[in-house]
Amino acid sequence: MKYTSYILAFQLCIVLGSLGCYCQDPYVKEAENLKKYFNAVDPDVADNGTLFLDILRNWKEESDRKIMQSQIVSFYFKLFKNFKDDQRIQKSVETIKEDINVKFFNSNKKKWDDFEKLTNYSVTDLNVQRKAVHELIQVMAELSPAAKIGKRKRSQMFRGRRASQ
């Protein structure tokens, strides 16, 4: 009886392992379709190195990688936007965008919408330029980790004083 359960477990592992080879993420097939469309399978594509992969390899910390990934995702969204009306790759683009939504935005629609909103701002629009410059000081303050830590320490210090009084 004991050997039978081992054999069944072994067979299950073999079946699941073989299924894993055939159950690729949907984006893989669609990315291959885009490679054919853009003629990105030719060896000359690799000339002069990679666009993104070397940059991603340079950064090991999660927060640093997220910054780089956000710029890369932004690039792909702009690329896809340029080809949104091409019916030959419409399905591939939509599938990949959905997969990015799951992997990068954790299926959070609000994050995705805000990200797209940011990537759609035109830097040549005078009104956008004026608003961006108007908000620059506040944005810079948000970027500074020292300011956030200082605020947190002060608020903890005041909370401690109130509790002891």
Curated annotation (Swiss-Prot):
Subunit and partners: Homodimer. Interacts with IFNGR1 (via extracellular domain); this interaction promotes IFNGR1 dimerization.
GO molecular function: cytokine activity; type II interferon receptor binding
Protein name, UniProt field: Interferon gamma
Upper taxonomic lineage: Eukaryota, Metazoa, Chordata, Craniata, Vertebrata
Signal peptide: 1-23
Pfam families according to UniProt: IFN-gamma (PF00714)
Source species of the chain: Papio anubis
Modified residues (Pyrrolidone carboxylic acid): 24
Gene Ontology, cellular component aspect: extracellular space
GO biological process, one term: defense response to virus
InterPro entries: 4_helix_cytokine-like_core, Interferon_gamma
Name of encoding gene: IFNG
